[in-house]
């Protein structure tokens, strides 16, 4: 009886340890675009794919690399920090970047540029390099990522759209060029090509419908597309084989968005 009880305890402990060690922990230093990409659909995708995940998203609306860097230097408690564990999302207001960095041993930490500056290479430095150095001091073992954001809808009313001649194609090309330059400078960054996935999805029967207001992703399949990219790049699993979908999605919407995310993740 004692032997059986001991065996049970060992099995339970090993299962618990395995679950904890297998958990992926990601921290996004972001804004509303990371809100779209990781806060709603990524956790259910991971659950359906048997991948435990903890998600932290530092949200400050429209935040650029320059602003993030300034906030870190000042230890400014200005973020809304959204913490997602076991599929439960818990927001914490008045959070600082330093607090989030010290909260956990993050496996992945992602950076991104504000959408309005995403295709303008001159806005990236020296702020990204300074952020990488500063964050590395807190989390020396984390894998750093770059979340590529997406271009605006063709009819977007965003005040920064004129920077790209109000052209979705010009904005797409500018983002791709900026991303390439960034990866050449920082080859250690893991690319999360959400922007490419949205572009590919727009080239299907879905058309230019991925955004709900011209720049934020729609709730039905826009966010799902970005989350599928994250899912593939974090887990190495094919999102097309993941059974989860938003309840209101049609089979065609699911198929087209999964294909776009998979192609983007594979660089196709």
Residue ranges of predicted features:
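Conserved catalytic region of serine esterases and O-acyltransferases that act on ester linkages
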Residues: 22, 210, 214-217, 221-223, ...
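A generic secondary-structure signal for well-formed alpha-helical elements
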Residues: 12, 49, 234-238
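Alpha-helical cap/lid subdomain in secreted, periplasmic
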Residues: 94-220, 232, 241
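Conserved SGNH/GDSL esterase-like catalytic core that processes O-acyl groups on lipids
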Residues: 25, 36-125
